[in-house]
UniProtKB/Swiss-Prot annotation:
Coiled-coil portions: none
Cleaved signal peptide residues: none
UniProt name for this protein: Zinc finger CCCH domain-containing protein 1
Record InterPro entries: ZFP36-like (IPR045877), Znf_CCCH (IPR000571), Znf_CCCH_sf (IPR036855)
Region (Disordered) residue spans: 20-45
SMART domains, per the entry: ZnF_C3H1 (SM00356)
Organism for this UniProt entry: Oryza sativa subsp. japonica
Gene3D superfamilies the UniProt entry points to: Zinc finger, CCCH-type
Keywords associated with the record: DNA-binding, Metal-binding, Repeat, Zinc, Zinc-finger
ZnF bounds (C3H1-type): 56-84, 139-167
Listed Pfam families: zf-CCCH
Length: 279
């Protein structure tokens, strides 16, 4: 009885283990926020700030979110998705980390920014710089940013190693480089110009038809002269057959294949002599 009761209890426990299974579905990931910046009081006076865990967290705008309107990282992206998520950047100083003072930034004189030259002038300067430096700037000159040329945007921005020039500006820059290269020439090579691929290539003119073959007749052989005389009317007959309208055979017009076979059979035996018998 004890053994049987133990077996029943084991079966009940086994059934309970197989039926009462609780599956917990993973919930949405918790949004992590940067730790608050702690203010400390240094020995020299004033207030300094300890650097947070992520120093540049949300200090720049996400370029992917700006261009496409969405980001695959969503809330976990380290860049700001909009101006409302931008955080003030921290600057390093001798006493520690501190936020830029608004009074200092307002009192600082504005920095004069040089006017941006037109794209064609930029390409012209790059071409001249690369040609004057020998082979050092050959890679940066002969290659442009394909993403900016084809799509009009580059994810690297100002840090891209290749110039951001469109297709129309490349053509204008190549014309400027060809004009400038004619004035002076390097001893080793001319200035390298940006090559523009051509989609259409000029088709060469159609070659004229070949002249008719010239037969060389040997006077010492009467057979060659007779064979050439017989071949001439046979060739003329073949041309006449080709120029004539398609004949009818059995109440129907002959196909082109039948006409070609007839023409071929006519020209095969054109060099045979009349009355000549094979020995």
């Amino acid at each position: 009885m004890a053994g049987r009761g133990g077996m029943v209890e084991w079966e009940v426990g086994r059934r309970r283990d197989s039926e009462d299974v609780i599956v917990l579905s993973p919930g949405p990931p918790a949004r992590r926020r940067p730790p608050p910046v702690k203010a400390v009081e240094p020995e020299s006076g004033g207030f300094a700030y300890e650097p947070p865990e992520k120093l540049f967290y949300k200090t720049r705008v996400c370029e992917t979110f700006v261009t496409s309107g969405r980001c695959m990282f969503e809330d976990g992206c380290t860049f700001a998705h909009g101006d409302e998520e931008l955080r003030p950047s921290l600057t390093a100083c001798a006493g520690g980390w501190r936020k830029p003072s608004p009074s200092l930034s307002a009192a600082a004189p504005p920095v004069a920014v040089a006017p941006t030259p037109p794209p064609a002038q930029v390409v012209h300067e790059l071409l001249a710089r690369g040609s004057g430096s020998g082979g050092g700037g050959h890679r940066a000159i002969t290659k442009v940013c394909f993403e900016f040329r084809d799509k009009g945007i580059c994810y690297f921005g100002e840090t891209c190693a290749f110039p951001h020039v469109s297709a129309a500006e490349i053509r204008q820059g190549s014309r400027l480089s060809s004009m400038s290269s004619s004035s002076w020439e390097m001893p080793a090579r001319r200035s390298v110009a940006v090559t523009v691929p051509r989609t259409f290539v000029s088709v060469p003119p159609v070659a004229p038809p070949p002249p008719p073959p010239h037969y060389r007749v040997n006077n010492s052989s009467s057979y060659n002269a007779a064979s050439m005389a017989a071949a001439a009317p046979a060739a003329s007959d073949a041309n006449l057959v080709a120029q004539q309208p398609p004949p009818e055979q059995g109440g129907r017009k002959m196909t082109r294949l039948e006409m070609l076979s007839l023409k071929k059979m006519t020209g095969i035996y054109g060099d045979w002599l009349e009355g000549y018998e094979h020995p």
